[in-house]
Amino acid sequence: QLYNLDSTNMGPEQWQGIAAAVQENYDRYDGFVITHGTDTMGYTAAALSYMIQKSPKPVVLTGSQKSIYNRDTDARNNLWRAVAYACHPDAWGVQIVFDNKVILGTRARKTRTKSFNAFSSIDYPETAMFRDRRLIQFLQRPAEYTHAVFSTALDPNVFVLRLVPGMRADIIPMLEGRYRALVLESFGVGGLPGGDDGAMFAAVRDWCGAGHLAAFTTQVPHEGSDLAVYEVGRAAKALPGVLE
């Protein structure tokens, strides 16, 4: 047992511990199943997807919405399916197995707080699904998944800022000296309030000018961002140090 804690307390240190354990035992086993609380399982799956790349062996995360001690728990079914997928010869990569679905670790997001159907695959097909305890594969193992590449170094000094209407720009200078990168969750396809004349743009410009990174994404779950669509995004996209 690596950890015994509420998944709310999971973070980069634990992600590194899991990745290191998989790396240490990679040649001894054909697959791995990790039980994990659902609240941050999507974060862990995404992190492991980048720390354990191109794995021809499955690294599977699963858990339950109800405790295994409850009569109507989903834990038993989820664990059975996770092990069944990990044992399947066509299984691969970092995946979440939950409520009959197999979802890529980079695409899994918890979209329901109580239902057994807790996770959704965002803007990408599910890898596979279980139907009547039979695995139906939708995505095949990519040809380049022949040897796992482990990259377990992480920089935790990243701040995620979700923009809201009326937010003051002075929050960004307050991050100086504490964080090295900023992830901006913007509106719609992306942009900064006020465009290139606004205080928010100036704050991001100064942030990037100090040698930091600013990565733009969208708060909208589906279809992604595109800073080039509107004027409020184009100026930000042109700044050095801005990623999208």
Outline where the language-model segments fall:
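ATP/NTP phosphate-donor binding region
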Residues: 1-24, 222
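Gly/Ser/Thr-rich loops at beta-strand to alpha-helix junctions
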Residues: 36-42, 101-103, 188-191, 222
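Short Gly/Thr/Asp-enriched flexible loops that form oxyanion-binding sites at enzyme active sites
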Residues: 37-57, 194-203
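Short, acidic/small-residue loops that bind anionic groups at enzyme active sites
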Residues: 45-74, 83-89, 208-218
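Internal gly/pro-rich beta-alpha loop/helix module
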Residues: 61-131
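Accessory alpha-helical/coil subdomains and C-terminal extensions
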Residues: 104-189, 194-195
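C-terminal non-catalytic interaction/assembly regions of soluble proteins
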Residues: 189-244
